[in-house]
Amino acid sequence: MLKVLQEPSLRLPLLLTCSMQAGQQTSGINAVFYYSQTIFKQAGLTELQSQYATICSGFINVCTAVFMLYLLPRTGRRPLLLGSIFVASVLLAALAAAMKFINAATWMPYVCMIAVLAYVLVYGFGLGPIPYFIASEMFEVAPRPAGMAWGSLANWGGNFLVGMCFPTMRDVIGPYSFLVFATVTMGLFVFQKLYFPETRGKTPAQVTEVCSHGLHSRPLRSAA
């Protein structure tokens, strides 16, 4: 696993893979699923409404995963990923605002619920599925296991970080917890927009060549 860190041409693919995997978790998806019912209750929904909203979140996630089996082979990874990350960031900020001003209007709890459900939907269109397989499209056969292992480590690291920090964040800063997730997710969007090349229709060798100069690489310019 350490050899892949010493190869300059693999550093950018590794950074992209690990940031995607970690960002998948630090976008707050597990905070939403782990604490969805609590979130809905804090938003002012009743016990029954909270249960229905939580079930609906899981149902949307499953339906999106099934639809992506059809969409992924036909659509570029870059637009799906960037669109998903950007909209997810906006929805997280909207969720923070809706929960902050939950008592401002009687319909505000429903804005909160819609923001959560929409977030789960857009997450499933890119940020959810793409990080899991992107290493197979960015690394050639020899370094691929190491690249995927580092990505998995980043994923679980992000998962652990959110699981440990979110309860405290929720208690200390309340709704602003989701503003933290929104900021981190927007940072991921900027990094991926600058450096993530389209991998659909390209071999891993071609992707590695495009990213061979590390952070000095310009994947979009090279593709043009």
Where in this protein do the model-derived segments appear?
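Alpha-helical transmembrane bundle of multi-pass membrane proteins
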Residues: 1-224
